[in-house]
Amino acid sequence: VCGLGSCMKKAESTEKSWVEQAVENARCQIGLEIDTIEASGKVLNPVTLNENEQVYYCGFSDWRSGFFPGSVWYLYELTDDNTLLSVAQKYTEALDEAKKLTWHHDIGFIVNCSYGNGLRLSGKAEYKDVMIEAANSLCTRFREKPGTIQSWNVSGNSWQAQRGWECPVIIDNMMNLELLFEATKLSGDSTYYKIAVAHAD
């Protein structure tokens, strides 16, 4: 029994140091990116490296734009480093216009990662308003007849139209339902909840 107990303690110790190392690696990588962005004098959303190994940045309407502020929020949560709090708020609030996006379904990715984590970790009241407005924007994509949230618009000679699609719905859309459930909690309005459930059904 003694031997088994010490094995378990060693495993816990190894696992903890692995987690701590992962957090430290994340802190280093995100810190380097913050330094790079800050040196540019702009507020940018890094996505990946392009073919020239340069950082590719996206605008607020890109489906990936909330991931960087979300990562900073998670790092703040894991480290309690208050310098990250102001950075997370800055990069989150740079996405303010995303709350008005109605031409694609990805608003849940954008807003939940950034404002959702910001509300959860900072309690800033204005983040609640952004979440609810974003949920309203997402609800404009709900189509009564099929009971789903349409992923993309289909118009003219778009690639969606060329495929004969009328109301495309992709699995990613399920990740937007969290925004609707949260909007019901924040507002007390069950409309968001009902749309989320209809889509899931």
Segments (PLM) and residue ranges:
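Bacterial N-terminal signal peptides
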Residues: 1-3, 92
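Glycan-recognition and catalytic cores of secretory/periplasmic carbohydrate-active enzymes
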Residues: 10-201
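A general, composition-driven signal for non-globular sequence regions
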Residues: 3-4, 111
